Amino acid sequence: MSQSNQPDSSVTQTQAEEAVRTLLRWAGEDPTREGLLDTPRRVAEAYGDWFSGYREEPREYLERTFEEVAGYDELIVLRDISYESHCEHHMAPIIGKVHVGYLPRGKVVGISKLARVVESYARRFQVQEKMTAQIAQCIQDVLQPLGVGVVVEGAHECMTTRGIHKRGVSMVTSKMLGTFREDARTRAEFLQFIEVGGKR
């Protein structure tokens, strides 16, 4: 596991909780009142869950592959993988779906592993464009398929609950590698399978 993904071990749980108390006071609240007494602990624990991706190496999920697939060499698509992330600019939630497709080159991976890769990158502070590229590049580097396609849909609460306050807006990003980028037919087949924004 990459050590660069590890949280700063010099920051203690106590320090994290005190930081939450500081923010509560800055917002105008009294962190010692009954309703907020356990809030610092709860927030610190929630952060441990929301940002657990920093303690994982996504590539490890793809290391176990299967080659006995009766020569299957057609498109594999996993769509509607739900995710929750947080934007690195305002620490506000990003909630959406990821669609992943790849054209295998002799080996495939369990579908739950693709979902775990998505979760590992999503459970970090993110920019949607970067997360899209990270997921695609991880699959390409480890599985070395003929091509990879990743499409990410996300509703950004930094836009819906602050600033311009525009609800119902969804951002869509994509990353195409290999034959998905070079062959319009492969790309079109993938996009037809996932039908982003359309009825299924």
Curated annotation (Swiss-Prot):
Gene Ontology cellular-component terms listed: cytoplasm
Family assignment from sequence similarity: Belongs to the GTP cyclohydrolase I family.
Keyword Amino-acid biosynthesis attached: no
Disulfide bonds: none
Organism: Xanthomonas euvesicatoria pv. vesicatoria (strain 85-10) (Xanthomonas campestris pv. vesicatoria)
Keywords for the protein's UniProt record, in alphabetical order: GTP-binding, Hydrolase, Metal-binding, Nucleotide-binding, One-carbon metabolism, Zinc
Lineage: Bacteria, Pseudomonadati, Pseudomonadota, Gammaproteobacteria, Lysobacterales
Organism domain of life: Bacteria
Protein known as: GTP cyclohydrolase 1
Amino-acid positions noted as binding Zn(2+) in the UniProt annotation, renumbered to this chain: C87, H90, C158
Keyword field contains GTP-binding: yes
Pfam families: GTP_cyclohydroI
PANTHER family linked: GTP CYCLOHYDROLASE 1, GTP CYCLOHYDROLASE I
Subunit structure: Toroid-shaped homodecamer, composed of two pentamers of five dimers.
GO biological process: one-carbon metabolic process; tetrahydrobiopterin biosynthetic process; tetrahydrofolate biosynthetic process
Pathway assignment: Cofactor biosynthesis; 7,8-dihydroneopterin triphosphate biosynthesis; 7,8-dihydroneopterin triphosphate from GTP: step 1/1
Listed PROSITE patterns: GTP_CYCLOHYDROL_1_1, GTP_CYCLOHYDROL_1_2
GO MF, any single term: GTP cyclohydrolase I activity
Enzyme Commission (EC) number: 3.5.4.16
Catalytic activity from the UniProt record: GTP + H2O = 7,8-dihydroneopterin 3'-triphosphate + formate + H(+)
Gene3D superfamilies referenced in this protein's UniProt entry, alphabetically: 1.10.286.10, 3.30.1130.10
